[in-house]
Amino acid sequence: AAAGRRGGGRVSTKRAGGFTFNHGAQFLTARAPAFVSAAETAIVHAALARWHVAGRDALAGQPTMRDFPDFLQQGLAVRQQTEIATIRHDSDSICLVDKTDETVSARQVIVTAPAPQAARLLQTAAPDLAALAATASYAPCWTAMYGFDAAPPAHNPAPIGDPDGPVGWALWESDRPGGDPSNHALTVQAAPGWSIEHLEDDAADVARTLLLAWQDASGQSVGTPALTSAHRWRYARVV
């Protein structure tokens, strides 16, 4: 079950106004053997592509980040927009109760929510695990998205970012592996410190500020976006 409209959580893609933005995780890395195997299978099926970026060997969803979780959940019965309220033991099974009080029983449960949310879900069924999850600290991330009618100016296709500045990551979507050159979309993710400082700011103010910061950091000058949006990831990364 997933509370969102699509699977993948922070491995996410947004489409709006004819533009496509990979506004969550920008790439994946595979180290654990089981995940390496899954990633290799996804590469064979064109759901992932190798991407050497930001000094690391990474993986990019194809054609978007969201397509990788879509690939993984093929053949599964997935319930979207279903928020689990409680997890509890019931004789020899585990019960999941959603916000409408509908109950589903299972032999095993995997919780992939961010640790603060997982801690609340596991308080009854696995208090020790809940206590461990509660010790995790997360940094938020403001993500701003801009769609333009015109193609971007000439630029270095590498992402830009400064962990100590407002802009932690910024990239034209067309510069991603397999990126559509007609998708004149820019994604800017704020650095953790800036996101913490401005966590409760108005989304429109965040978008305006980050566009100016990106222009200063990149040296690129762009006109008024045809589309502007911002998304706040409250639990973006473990710190």
Question: Where are each of the predicted segments found?
Answer:
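Glycine-rich FAD pyrophosphate-binding loop
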Residues: 1-17
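A conserved short coil-to-beta-strand element within the FAD-binding core of flavoproteins
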Residues: 80-95
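A short alpha-helix-loop-beta-strand transition element characteristic
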Residues: 18-22, 34-58, 81, 130, ...
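Active-site substrate-recognition segment that forms the wall
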Residues: 145-199, 205-218
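Glycine-centered tight beta-turn/hairpin loop motif at sheet-sheet or coil-to-beta transitions
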Residues: 99-101
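Central helical "cap/lid" subdomain
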Residues: 8, 103-157, 220
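Short beta-strand to alpha-helix junction loop
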Residues: 26-35, 48-73, 200-209
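Flavin (FAD/FMN) cofactor-binding core of flavoprotein oxidoreductases
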Residues: 215-239
